[in-house]
């Protein structure tokens, strides 16, 4: 799944480990999302990441 997680984390100077620690999501789940290997992340996972990063799910996901 294409997403903007890498760009957003870079802008906020955060690491996957920071997101994992603050959201309670596993580092492996977030790493798969970061490297765009996550095939079907749940809505809950996307919402937790988006909430922590203070963006919408639409902002997190690449459209087009």
Predicted regions and their residues:
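DNA major-groove recognition helix of helix-turn-helix/homeodomain DNA-binding modules
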Residues: 44-59
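Key DNA-contact positions within bacterial/archaeal DNA-binding proteins
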Residues: 17, 28, 58
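A short, Lys/Arg-rich alpha-helix, primarily the initiator
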Residues: 1-17
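Recognition helix of helix-turn-helix/homeodomain-like DNA-binding domains
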Residues: 25-40
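Short, Lys/Arg-enriched C-terminal cap helix and immediately downstream tail that follows
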Residues: 8, 42-43
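DNA major-groove recognition helix of helix-turn-helix
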Residues: 9, 34, 53, 61-64
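The alpha-helix within a helix-turn-helix
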Residues: 9, 20, 50
């Amino acid at each position: 799944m294409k997403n903007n997680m890498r760009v957003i984390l870079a802008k906020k100077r955060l690491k996957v480990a920071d997101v994992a620690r603050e959201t309670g999501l596993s580092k492996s789940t977030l790493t798969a999302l970061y490297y765009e290997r996550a095939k079907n992340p749940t809505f809950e996972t996307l919402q937790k990441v988006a909430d922590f990063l203070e963006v919408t799910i639409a902002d997190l996901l690449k459209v087009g």
